[in-house]
Curated annotation (Swiss-Prot):
Keywords: Disulfide bond, Extracellular matrix, Metal-binding, Metalloenzyme inhibitor, Metalloprotease inhibitor, Protease inhibitor, Secreted, Signal, Zinc. Residues 24-27, 88-89 are annotated as: Involved in metalloproteinase-binding. Residues 1-23 form the signal peptide. Mediates a variety of processes including matrix regulation and turnover, inflammation, and angiogenesis, through reversible inhibition of zinc protease superfamily enzymes, primarily matrix metalloproteinases (MMPs). Regulates extracellular matrix (ECM) remodeling through inhibition of matrix metalloproteinases (MMP) including MMP-1, MMP-2, MMP-3, MMP-7, MMP-9, MMP-13, MMP-14 and MMP-15. Additionally, modulates the processing of amyloid precursor protein (APP) and apolipoprotein E receptor ApoER2 by inhibiting two alpha-secretases ADAM10 and ADAM17. Residues 105-188 are annotated as: Mediates interaction with EFEMP1. It comes from Rattus norvegicus. This is Metalloproteinase inhibitor 3. Belongs to the protease inhibitor I35 (TIMP) family. The gene is Timp3. Pfam families: TIMP. Interacts with EFEMP1. Interacts with KDR. GO terms for molecular function: metalloendopeptidase inhibitor activity; zinc ion binding.
Amino acid sequence: MTPWLGLVVLLSCWSLGHWGTEACTCSPSHPQDAFCNSDIVIRAKVVGKKLVKEGPFGTLVYTIKQMKMYRGFSKMPHVQYIHTEASESLCGLKLEVNKYQYLLTGRVYEGKMYTGLCNFVERWDHLTLSQRKGLNYRYHLGCNCKIKSCYYLPCFVTSKKECLWTDMLSNFGYPGYQSKHYACIRQKGGYCSWYRGWAPPDKSISNATDP
């Protein structure tokens, strides 16, 4: 078993990604949670890949050109390679080579960065302006807050440190408006509430603060 296989279960508990393929099952997570729970968060372009004979299905090793690091300076100040399972059924991630810039999140294990389908991985040009601003500073400000998922009504916050995440209840589904345009940030008095960045107001979001 590869080190990555041992990480799959852990990663699927906290990170954002795509709904599972076959045996790969991922719980939805707000981008802020994915940011705060990741060892590494970077913007990078994939410039190469190779299949390493490791484990039952092998491991894909992507060579990347790191553009910017948002989180993880103390763990790995510069990332040159990322590792993922070769099989999508084991949450392996497929990335285009020499085509797009990506936002990549992942864990560090034995000096290597691992990522997969259950991590928050997205093409950079698909991120909203609010998400980009979140990566630069807003998400970091909210790492002491807790985003509470709401899958069905009624649901309530039970602590002043919680923000209620209701994207899963909307007609647009997940990822929704709160994922794309809001960060959960501590306000005066120690309360956490949704903070809207550069996005049109959505009156359905409660306890939101304008810039």
